[in-house]
Amino acid sequence: MEELKDKYIRFDWAIKRLLRQKANFGVLEGFLTVFIGEPIKIIDILESEGNQQEADDKFNRVDIKAKNSKGDIIIVEIQNTSELYYLERVLYGVAKAITEHINLGNTYKEVKKVYSISILYFDLGKGSDYIYVGQNNFIGLHTQDQLIISTKEKDTIVRKSPAEIFPTYMLVRVNEFNKVAKSPLEEWVDYLKNGVINPDTKAPGLRSEAHV
């Protein structure tokens, strides 16, 4: 098993050095397709933080910011050690991404949907799951129903839930994953935790990752 693990580079190193290259977008697209739950096509890698240069650097954080074919902004962040006010920093990063990608004079229609995926290798708090999703919905104080927003697009009334407009946050607690990987999502988390890729994997992106 150790021999198998050694075949594959860490995903954080791949994000830092390899997945920013267009030829390797398939790996990142596969990862995002599995985690977001819809086909993702990356068209651009946006300016992002991180400055480590060696694969064995003991770095604390690496991130990548991308734009998909719908214009959505996707932030993938790997955090190796605990950080004070971590969620506050995630919120700041999302707010910054929103404001950076709307120009003065644009209408609010140009505000982009943002996905923030945090891959965490430290204990953020208590919880029985290894993935937590945060979305914004408006629930009736008295009726408990969910508000659906009506907007006009090309002379057509389109109804959206607030979750389609507001940012989506995903917290992946890698160290809490203790299952036999069966689904594509489980295979990806198993790889993030153990560096193992099943030779028969059908998970989008993982087969490409094995050959990056």
Question: Residues of each region from the PLM?
Answer:
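Elongated, amphipathic alpha-helical interaction scaffolds
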Residues: 1-212
